[in-house]
Amino acid sequence: MATTYDWSQRKIMVPEKEEIALSTNDLRVFYNGTKEAIHGVTMSFPKNEITALIGPSGSGKSTYLRALNRMNDTIDGARVTGEINYEGVNINENKVNVFEVRKQIGMVFQRPNPFPKSIYENIAFIHRRDGVRDRKKLDEIVETSLKQAALWDQVKDNLNQSALAMSGGQAQRLCIARALSVKPEIILMDEPASALDPISTMQIEETMMELKENYTIIIVTHNMAQASRASDNTAFFYSGDLIEYDKTSTIFTQPSLQSTEDYVSGHFG
């Protein structure tokens, strides 16, 4: 007989760390005006840590992630209420410059999406568009970003090669480098390794672990092993609600709620 859960139960961690990179207060996302996809989520993300958002398909984790840098603004009929607090400002207000928000809170998507340009131009063109003309400065930006994404040694002799010829893992790390090149403080990753082979997945995880020294990372993943290996904190979503949020070690070994324990152990999903 199927287990019945009390979905009204919640266990939400209040991070002990004083430095909070980002937080939401009563965040709600609506589609088509009235369909509520995210139900009043309040949570905080500690600085320089990796937080994994987990939950079954349709749980709202990707919708919540996209709200954090206002990507849902691009969806017709989408509406977001509540607060998204970053550096003392509620960035979910109309007066906020959304393009500046997305520079500070970058996004890496599920499938690698390099532009149909050279490896070099995938990074350089953003800065050229923003007025950087000095070739030495562009070279420095490209090299630094590729090194941060652990890709420089593999591509430094082929920077004029089309990015479309790269392997999936390399292309995804190029997308990470591109996001890093504008010097964000937070990186959002929506299942960044789901389309990759195991070796590329491991490389992405290693890159994330290195990046958290300088960045705060929030990742959506369906891969429980990945969440347990690569994250410091884990948040379990179900049907648009945040059910449990705690240290990853606690979520995977001593969760407070039966629903969380059953999900991470594969009993449903």
UniProtKB/Swiss-Prot annotation:
The kind of enzyme this is, by top-level EC class, is translocase
Binding residues annotated for ATP, in chain numbering: 55-62
Protein name per UniProt? Phosphate import ATP-binding protein PstB 2
Task: Show the InterPro entries listed in the entry.
Answer: AAA+_ATPase, ABC_transporter-like_ATP-bd, ABC_transporter-like_CS, P-loop_NTPase, PstB-like
Q: Does the keyword Nucleotide-binding apply?
A: yes
**Listed GO MF terms:** ATP binding; ATP hydrolysis activity; ATPase-coupled phosphate ion transmembrane transporter activity
GO CC terms on record? plasma membrane
Question: What CDD domains does its record include?
Answer: ABC_PstB_phosphate_transporter
Which species is this record about? Answer: Lactococcus lactis subsp. lactis (strain IL1403)
Q: What is its EC number?
A: 7.3.2.1
Q: Which family does it belong to?
A: Belongs to the ABC transporter superfamily. Phosphate importer (TC 3.A.1.7) family.
Q: What does this gene product do?
A: Part of the ABC transporter complex PstSACB involved in phosphate import. Responsible for energy coupling to the transport system.
Q: Which UniProt keywords apply?
A: ATP-binding, Cell membrane, Membrane, Nucleotide-binding, Phosphate transport, Translocase, Transport
Q: Which Pfam families match?
A: ABC_tran (PF00005)
Q: Which residues form the ABC transporter domain?
A: 22-264
Database matches in SUPFAM superfamilies = P-loop containing nucleoside triphosphate hydrolases (SSF52540)
